[in-house]
Swiss-Prot record:
Necessary for normal cell division and for the maintenance of normal septation. It comes from Caldanaerobacter subterraneus subsp. tengcongensis (strain DSM 15242 / JCM 11007 / NBRC 100824 / MB4). Its cofactor is Mg(2+). InterPro entries: G_ENGB_dom (IPR030393), GTP-bd (IPR006073), GTP-bd_ribosome_bio_YsxC (IPR019987), P-loop_NTPase (IPR027417), Small_GTP-bd (IPR005225). GO terms for molecular function: GTP binding; metal ion binding. This is Probable GTP-binding protein EngB. Belongs to the TRAFAC class TrmE-Era-EngA-EngB-Septin-like GTPase superfamily. EngB GTPase family. It holds the Pfam family MMR_HSR1. GO terms for biological process: division septum assembly. Keywords: Cell cycle, Cell division, GTP-binding, Magnesium, Metal-binding, Nucleotide-binding, Septation. Signal peptide: none annotated. GO terms for cellular component: cytosol.
Length: 194
C-alpha cells in the first residue's frame, strides 16, 4: 500500500464528535509512552502528523487521522500513566471504553507494547475486550532497535504465550530501523479490502 494522503481530522472527547461517515477504522492502543504517535508518523511517512512527546499522557482525546481517504487511524489515549489525577484517568478510561463500545466502523486494533516490557494488566484487559467483541487485533512490539535478535524472539514467544495468539499476529516494529512498516501496511490493506 502506498500512503498518498494522511490528514488529522480532529480530536474527539465524546461520542458526538466521532466521524459520522462509514469509513473503516483501525485503532492504535497501548500504554502511555509506548510509541503510538511515533508509529503513526513512521508508517504514514509523515514527520509531525501525530504529535510526539516525551511526556507520557500527551494524547488526551481520541485522535482521528484519515488515510488515503479510505480508512481512519484512531489514536486512543495511552493508559496506565501514573502521574495524572484519578479523575483524569477515569475520563481517559471512559473515552476509550465509549469509543470501543460504540464505533460501528472499527475493523482492527493494533495493541502496542514496548518490546522490553512485560504486558501490563491493562494490556490483558484490552486483549480480553478484543476477544469478547470478536475484533481482529495484532500486537506491535515497539522500540525493537533497543534489543538484539534473540531478545526480540524471546519477547515474541512471551507475547504469544501470554495472549494465546500465533506469531503471525505479532509485529516487531522500530521507527529507527524502519522495521515492521510493511507488515502494518499489509494490515491496513486487508482492512480496506474487506
Amino acid at each position: 500500500m502506498k500512503i498518498k494522503t494522511a490528514e488529522f481530522v480532529g480530536s474527539a472527547f465524546n461520542e458526538s464528535q466521532y466521524p459520522k461517515d462509514k469509513i473503516p477504522q483501525i485503532a492504535i492502543v497501548g500504554k502511555s509512552n509506548v510509541g503510538k504517535s511515533t508509529l503513526i508518523n513512521t508508517v504514514l511517512g509523515r514527520k509531525n502528523l501525530a504529535k510526539v512527546s516525551s511526556t507520557p499522557g500527551k494524547t488526551r482525546g481520541i485522535n482521528f487521522y484519515l488515510v488515503n481517504r479510505a480508512f481512519y487511524i484512531v489514536d486512543l489515549p495511552g493508559y496506565g500513566y501514573a502521574k495524572v489525577s484519578k479523575e483524569m484517568k477515569k475520563q481517559w478510561a471512559y473515552n476509550i471504553e465509549t469509543f470501543l463500545n460504540t464505533s460501528k466502523n472499527l475493523k482492527h486494533a493494533l495493541l502496542l507494547i514496548d518490546i522490553r516490557r512485560e504486558p501490563t494488566e491493562d494490556d490483558f484487559m484490552m486483549v480480553n475486550w478484543f476477544s469478547f467483541k470478536n475484533l481482529p487485533f495484532s500486537v506491535v512490539l515497539t522500540k525493537a532497535d533497543k534489543v538484539n535478535k534473540s531478545e526480540a524472539n524471546k519477547a515474541i514467544e512471551n507475547i504469544c504465550r501470554s495472549f494465546n495468539i500465533s506469531s503471525d499476529r505479532v509485529i516487531v516494529f522500530s521507527a529507527v530501523e524502519k522495521t515492521g512498516i510493511s507488515e502494518i501496511l499489509r494490515i491496513f490493506e486487508e482492512v480496506i479490502e474487506k
